[in-house]
């Protein structure tokens, strides 16, 4: 293990001991915000220090076995112990490297998931609906909460655009690699000749701002229009201008919300989505220079980049960033994304480790 890494782990061990002391004091809950901060830090450091303790134990085991080598009767036993200890140290060191990787500050945030139909007309809109169902089924498996923020339905079903808020532990860290172009190849229900059509949708995963105030938005930069919500009519036809369109003039970002009958609620939702879009734009601009110097295969989140193909006739899904093909499309479309997401996270960790190695 590198000296710099060992020094870092020693510092974390010392810090954990300090946290244990602070959390054992009688007045620790006097300041609840500080208490939550300390318990969160303790929860993050605990597993790292525990792994480091196991690594140090393996190192001690190796040192003890080295001393036995001088005894001919113990040589075979000692060599087995040394080999076992070194294998354990190598495995633990790899785990510790991953644990020490820079943490994405957005990983613990809730998200806004935006799906837009692209090329392919009605078929693209139908596929947008299929993608939404896929993510909602995945969210259901994770016991995450889902809230519809905005939807623009197409005539034949599906969506021209849909935005949902997903709240739950790990929402952003698990879904952040879904941003990009999603292509589908299949025979549309309206196709009489049995020809395979290709269409596409774009997905954007945006971390939710803790508070709207976290993103600086000058009210003078906003144009807010109200209009009558579109609907199928009938007894629930919306007779008031409850739908809201918010335009952020400096960036040209436009958000519409019309799902609620309350204009106030629609405006509140639109401002939350707008804050997330501005934050997302700032994040990508900030990382553009880094991306230019070190091409990341999966971390760019560029919506124009085609990241995945869903081929229904062959029952396969291919993620082009990591050259992964899975022949279990039906399960994937039903929200079984663990294998795919796990592979993307592993590749991202490998990229981070490689970049840290270059920095060293």
Curated annotation (Swiss-Prot):
Pfam families: PCRF, RF-1. SMART domains: PCRF (SM00937). The modification N5-methylglutamine is found at residue 235. GO terms for cellular component: cytoplasm. Keywords: Cytoplasm, Methylation, Protein biosynthesis. It comes from the Bacteria. It is found in: Cytoplasm. Methylated by PrmC. Methylation increases the termination efficiency of RF1. One of its GO terms (molecular function) is translation release factor activity, codon specific. Transmembrane segments: none annotated. InterPro entries: PCRF, Pep_chain_release_fac_I, Pep_chain_release_fac_I_sf, Prokaryotic/Mito_RF, RF-1. The keyword Cytoplasm applies. Belongs to the prokaryotic/mitochondrial release factor family. Peptide chain release factor 1 directs the termination of translation in response to the peptide chain termination codons UAG and UAA. This is Peptide chain release factor 1.
